[in-house]
Amino acid sequence: MTATGAPALLGDDHWFDDGLYSAVTELAHRSPGPLDTMVSLWSAYGLALFGALLLAGWWRARPPASATRDAGGPARAMLALTAPAVVLVAFAVSSVAKSLLRERRPCQTLHVVTVEACPALGDWSLPSNHAVIAAAAATVLLCTDRRLAALAVPAALLMAASRVWVGVHYPHDVALGLVVGVLVSWPLMVAARRAAPLAGRLRETRLRPLVARR
């Protein structure tokens, strides 16, 4: 646990969800240590799960090489292959938004005890990059593999909640992060779906393993 408070030079920032943030961090402070440890580990390393799900989605989307008449197979594989790039675009949009909005972390402006150490000044809060990435990954999986999405969607919500629990984000930071992740990734996946049928041509090139199993 780390006690934090804002020096006078930071000003006095107030948001509508200050009370909710303080209540969550107080609950985290009073919770058993093992629970806080698990939430902290998920908050720090949980994005790796989304990377694994994206990889699994691409692997599952590739049709067998023998399925020569499955025209949609390479298209599905190509769509899954573009998914990580879509998530990266969502992250880039989030990073630009952070630099423009320049909202300070709640642990820098409120006197609270947090599970994680408060990020340094200049590490902006709005929107939550973790929430953006998780929501974008869940969205692209909804477009490519509903079974994996059934795991990714609740995992994205848990990722967003964990960022508030450990004290590094306001609730509105993660809420906006989820919205940004969906709004950026969904139209990009729609556009990618229109171009995906061109992937059939890759089956006749050395790039065939990208869209079909050997």
Which residues make up each language-model segment?
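Hydrophobic, aromatic-rich alpha-helical transmembrane segments
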Residues: P34-T37, G72, R76, A80, ...
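Hydrophobic alpha-helical transmembrane segments
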Residues: W42-R62, H130-A135, L142
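Membrane-interfacial segments
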Residues: W59-A67, L100-R105, A191-R203
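Membrane-embedded catalytic cores of phosphoryl/pyrophosphoryl-handling enzymes
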Residues: A117-R214
